Amino acid sequence: MQDPRLLMGKPVRERILEEVRSVTEKVDRIGKLVSISIGDVPEVAVYVRNQARAASTAGLPFDQEFWGADVTQDECKAMIQKMNDDPEVLGIILQRPVPDHINVRSLQSAIHPLKDVEGMNPASIGNIVYNDVAMAPCTAAAAVELIRETGLKLEGLEVVMVGHSEIVGKPAAMMLMAEGATVTVCHHLTRSVAMHSRRADVIVVAVGKAHLIGADMVKPGAAVIDIGINQITEADGNTRIVGDVDTDAVKEIAGWVTPVPGGVGPVTVAILMRNAVRAHERQKAAGWYA
């Protein structure tokens, strides 16, 4: 029997994909999602496969583009511009990591905001400041979605965000503030993360440091959303994926904790599909379709 304190992503993923499919089934014509992979990065294949599977479930066409590791920045931008101009392309997904000579932020900026289904264009992230979260960064939006899943009322909630990256920590903090939560953001210069986390109703952690959050840093009954992904080597030499939270210890104290893997990840992919139908709605409102 599954531990009820584990906040699993799969049911949330399935609900969101079902909602997306209910929209796509009513649309006469919808463009395709295009995944761009640059260079040969084996771990990217897993993400692309998960996205393709989710797109199929949601009723969204999905294409894959593979660009060689020797492609130039200018060539990438030119190909992205062609996709921006192509009415058959609904949204563009830029897989990461990319080769060292490619400036990923520049390419994210090159994607038209209305085709930015990942929510990575600076315009998309900037919109969150104005409480426009329709196409927010997927991982940040997934964290907020999982907090909602607990049933906790966001208004007035004490939330501690551990990590302040541009694509997760900062957007998630702004999204939670837009919902009325009181948000404290901790980072590598914070003197005592534990001092803040112990008073939090919700802890969201995304720093990439295995088992950073232990049971002694969590208030009884709190919700803990773990976005971290780390590979550790066990004493027997085997490797495994863990989060930023010591899940086994923390679940004895917390009311909810997302496991890694199986927590935020599945929801992130579903949010990508939800962003896609929102992109379609905004493109239609902008007069892109006859």
Swiss-Prot record:
**Would you indicate the residue range of the signal peptide?**
none
Its annotated pathway reads: One-carbon metabolism; tetrahydrofolate interconversion
Q: Which Pfam families match?
A: THF_DHG_CYH, THF_DHG_CYH_C
In this chain, NADP(+) is annotated as bound at 163-165, 229
Q: Which domain of life is it from?
A: Bacteria
**Gene Ontology molecular functions:** methenyltetrahydrofolate cyclohydrolase activity; methylenetetrahydrofolate dehydrogenase (NADP+) activity
Q: Name one GO biological process term.
A: tetrahydrofolate interconversion
Which GO cellular component terms, listed alphabetically, does the Swiss-Prot or TrEMBL entry include?
cytosol
Q: Which UniProt keywords apply?
A: Amino-acid biosynthesis, Histidine biosynthesis, Hydrolase, Methionine biosynthesis, Multifunctional enzyme, NADP, One-carbon metabolism, Oxidoreductase, Purine biosynthesis
Under catalytic activity, the entry for this protein gives:
(6R)-5,10-methylene-5,6,7,8-tetrahydrofolate + NADP(+) = (6R)-5,10-methenyltetrahydrofolate + NADPH; (6R)-5,10-methenyltetrahydrofolate + H2O = (6R)-10-formyltetrahydrofolate + H(+)
Question: Which family is annotated?
Answer: Belongs to the tetrahydrofolate dehydrogenase/cyclohydrolase family.
Q: Assembly state and interactors?
A: Homodimer.
Explain the purpose of this protein.
Answer: Catalyzes the oxidation of 5,10-methylenetetrahydrofolate to 5,10-methenyltetrahydrofolate and then the hydrolysis of 5,10-methenyltetrahydrofolate to 10-formyltetrahydrofolate.
This chain belongs to which protein, by name?
Bifunctional protein FolD 3
